Amino acid sequence: MSFSVDVLANIAIELQRGIGHQDRFQRLITTLRQVLECDASALLRYDLRQFIPLAIDGLAKDVLGRRFALEGHPRLEAIARAGDVVRFPADSGLPDPYDGLIPGQESLKVHACVGLPLFAGQNLIGALTLDGMQPDQFDVFSDEELRLIAALAAGALSNALLIEQLESQNMLPGDAAPFEAVKQTQMIGLSPGMTQLKKEIEIVAASDLNVLISGETGTGKELVAKAIHEASPRAVNPLVYLNCAALPESVAESELFGHVKGAFTGAISNRSGKFEMADNGTLFLDEIGELSLALQAKLLRVLQYGDIQRVGDDRSLRVDVRVLAATNRDLREEVLAGRFRADLFHRLSVFPLSVPPLRERGDDVILLAGYFCEQCRLRQGLSRVVLSAGARNLLQHYSFPGNVRELEHAIHRAVVLARATRNGDEVILEAQHFAFPEVTLPPPEAAAVPVVKQNLREATEAFQRETIRQALAQNHHNWAACARMLETDVANLHRLAKRLGLKD
């Protein structure tokens, strides 16, 4: 079988459409799956000896959250080491990373697999994987045809990585080094709230502004701080962490600013504080709202003048530190209550960030579940850990008051319970493995199967209604903010909401 010019032209056009948008790779994968008639396909980005899914088709949604470390996936390692098309025979002894992850085929294993490494020059930047349930599914395609597909995909991925780096570093093309490995904290999520947060992180990271990160317990505020530091000019210098809630009042000042020998009982030598350790780098103050008013005053002085005094020392030391602070409290309310200094609040919140709770992140819960499943698989030496349809349904309808941290612990506990009831190294997580409070669930199929008796207008209105509801929830029912998120005029949004029955 050979590809027609029209087929190749269509693939090339899909690769160029909407460059810079979230779905540019999804269109490629969808087109390839149709052309190659495979059961599943994935586009993966290579970074620091792991493959990160950028787009999938025909695979369970949680695959997008998984991070495939080469040492745990021999097929992917073989693709990474190869300089050409890799075909895995049906009787290959190497486990397929997507076994159990094709919806409706969870109990079956992939029988045909092709891997296409993607290169920019001599540098591996990603891979395309094609999977089928029939052993000879890809025999009709020659290696030359598959190389052509790989070349088109590699060009698109290469350009996207270059644009991404130019946008994040604000560099001129002549200064760019697009294929060097750039450390980047993994922030998993494609929901509107997380997409907006990532954009704001990218904006503020390049500056030297202090940042106040707000969010409920367990939402990942420390991860946000790491992402800001790693994307900043200070990334080559230390990121120092201090949990203010765990500081006894008697040692808090010493922890922050250090002390000299003999400053107090037990001070047997000079000791640097966190500000000195973070000099030329970043200091992350977690739970900043727990600091006493006395310490808040001393912290304010450092932010104002850039110098510190060790406990027991009259000399001042200059420090160059960027401060990132996090809190699960409403500091505006704390200021009004007299528990937090207004001047310190304004110094810290030059660029405030809000981390959305997991219950407002939609399908991100499934992506995160996939990430934690893959972590468990590696740590416990399992061949696979997958979620059943019932488990996915439960996770999507539970509110997670403990947010991402609660989800992580729930997945780890579920894996232990599932292993206790099943022999072997393959684990399928069922709803009964999760000890959540009672949740009212629709049938598992209800979330995935569309209403077939709707006409086009009814289906469109249902989609619009649900989109507006989600946007309102994420913006605390602020219609102006909702309109900005949906990129529409607020007056038009009000009219549409009335027509859809969302407003009186």
UniProtKB/Swiss-Prot annotation:
Molecular-function GO term, any one: ATP binding
4-aspartylphosphate: modified positions: D57
Entry annotated with the keyword Transcription regulation: yes
GO biological process, one term: phosphorelay signal transduction system
Family annotation (Pfam families): GAF (PF01590), Sigma54_activat (PF00158)
Keywords, comma-separated and alphabetical: ATP-binding, DNA-binding, Nucleotide-binding, Phosphoprotein, Transcription, Transcription regulation
Annotated binding of ATP, by residue: 215-222, 278-287
Organism domain of life: Bacteria
DNA-binding region location: 479-498
Pathway(s) where this gene product acts: Nitrogen metabolism; nitric oxide reduction
The Sigma-54 factor interaction domain, residue ranges: 187-416
General function of this protein: Required for the expression of anaerobic nitric oxide (NO) reductase, acts as a transcriptional activator for at least the norVW operon. Activation also requires sigma-54.
UniProt cross-references to NCBIfam families, sorted A to Z: PRK05022.1
Protein name: Anaerobic nitric oxide reductase transcription regulator NorR
GN (gene name): norR
